[in-house]
C-alpha cells in the first residue's frame, strides 16, 4: 500500500490473518452453548457464526485482491467512475475487507511518514503534494488538503475517490505498485501537456502516497513537456531532489523504458 515493492504480499498477509480469525470463531461456534442459538435458513447460528462468516469473507476477498494485484488485472472491479472519479456505495459494501484496511493504512502512513527535507536537512512530515517543477506537482490522495484549484489532475488510484477541485480530470486506475502501461503513459503525458498548454496553472499527478505510480507518470509528463530528454533525467534531476520519497520499482522502470523507446526515441 505505501511501498512500491511487493504490495500484493500485504493482501496475502491480510487474507492469512483473516483466515486465522475465521478459524478461531469457527472453533468457538462449535464449542458454544447452543441454548442461545437460533435457526436461519436451516443453519444453526450462534454468537460466533457472524464473526466467522465476516472473517471468512475477508479471507476470500483479500485473497482475490492479492491475485489480481499480482496478475495486474481487474482494475475495474471496485467500480470507480473514470469520468468523475467517484466510487459507488455498493463497492464499500461488497469490498469492505479491502476498503477498510486500505483506508486505515493510508491514513496512518500519511500521519507517521517523515522525510529528510533536502533544503533544511531536517526530518519533516511528507507533504501531501510537492511542486517538483514549475506547474508540475506530485502527491498522494490527500492533495485536497492544499485547498488548491488545479488546472488538471491525473489520478492513478483504483482504491480512492477523487477529492480535488480541478478543471480537467484523467483517471488511469491501477493497483498500488502497478505502473501504467507504455500506451497509458503516452496518453497521460500527452493529455497533461495539452492541459498545461491550454489552461496554464498547476497540474497534479497523484496516486495513494505520491511515491511510485504517480512518479512513473510524471516522469513521462516532464519528458513530453520538453523539460528533460529522458525519464531517467526526469526522475533523478526533476523529481527526486524535491520529493526524495519517490521510488520506482523494476516494473515501473521497464514500462518507462519501453515508453521511451516507443514514443520518444522514434519521434526524434
Give the positions of each predicted feature:
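Non-catalytic regulatory/accessory regions that flank a structured catalytic core
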Residues: 1-132, 187, 255, 261-268
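Cysteine-based protein phosphatase catalytic domain of the PTP/DSP
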Residues: 91-205, 220-267
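Conserved G/P- and acidic residue-centered "switch" motifs that form tight phosphate/ATP-binding loops
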Residues: 210
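Hydrolases whose catalytic domains are alpha/beta-hydrolase-1, hotdog thioesterase
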Residues: 213-221
